[in-house]
Structure formats: C-alpha cells, structure tokens
Amino acid sequence: KKHPTSAGLLMFGNEYDIVREFNAYFLDYQEQYDADTRWTDRIISSSGDWSGNVYDFYFRIYNRLIQDIKVPFRMDGGNRVDDTPVHQALREALANCLVNADYYGRQGLVILKKRDGITMSNPGSFRIELDAAKSGGVSDPRNGTMLKMFNLIDIGERAGSGIPNIFRVWREQGWAAPTFTEQLEPERT
C-alpha cells in the first residue's frame, strides 16, 4: 500500500490525517491588535474549514504578514516590482519556522502578529549554535524534505543564509534586531 512520506503528509495532507501521525500537530496564527481582546483574528489548523496542512498555512499566513509592508514604486525593465527585501525576509522566516519545527513535539507552532512586531515560535530546540546561525553558511534543517519542497517553489535556499539576511534587512529598515530565544522544557524556539 502506498502512502505519503511524513513530509508529504505535513505539507499536503489534511489535518485530521496529520494528527494521526503527529498527535500534537497544531498550527496557530493570531493577530493581536487590541490589548483588551485575546485576538483580533485567528487561523488554526484544526478549524475544519481548510486543509490545515503546512503548505496551505504558509500561504494563508504569509499573505497576512505582508499586508502592512510598504511597497515603494520600482520598475525592472517594463515590469513593476512588488517584492521587497522585507517580503523576502518574511518568507524566509516563516519557512524556517515551519521546516524546523519538531512536529512530534509537545506543543504546536504559533505565529503572533502585533502592531509592533511578529513572533514565530515552534516546538523543538535550535539545531545549530545561535552564533553560527547568525553568521550564516550552516544549514541543518529538521525537516529537509519539506525544505526541498519549499525550494522547488523558490522559497528558501538551504545555504544557511536566511537568518543573516533577516538581520541585514531589519538593520537596513532601521528596525530593532530580531531576537531568538530557546526554551528547553518543553523544547521550543
């Protein structure tokens, strides 16, 4: 009997099938714009009104993350360019969060968007030293096949350049440097 790989199931399966293999699988996106409200909007993998898989989550959430990004007028040849370095950095950050999650971990993945920042949190520890990740050149994805699937649609490069690029883009924007934290019980980044 044929069946998908774990990466195929996570990327393209339905949530009700995914949780049979990954019991704690849960993807959660929250917009928190009002301090008096738990969330202004929320998308969760278990809602039942969409597939709940990683691939569909990526595109639903990426489109939410970029809504407030300014796009200055720029032409390349005769075509308008709407893709900025900030867009590229957000794609990289979101893909990194998804492909480096430990889907067997005890807690789900959470993306939190507030007026003044974005927090991305996934189950699992950081697989390389943080200083090495910031310096670049080291790629050790937890879910390499998922990363390859993203690479096939031009998201990510598997060159270990994503985190340094995110820091560079934030610096060029004059924003505070991103922060990384690692919690060990339960493992969370």
Task: Specify the residue positions occupied by each region the protein language model found.
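Bergerat-fold GHKL/Histidine-kinase-like ATPase
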Residues: 1-116, 151, 155-161, 171-186
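Core structural elements
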Residues: 119, 188-189
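Glycine-rich/acidic phosphate-handling loop/turn and adjacent ATP-lid/helix
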Residues: 118-154
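Short alpha-helical Gxxx[C/S/T] motif in the catalytic ATP-binding
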Residues: 162, 166
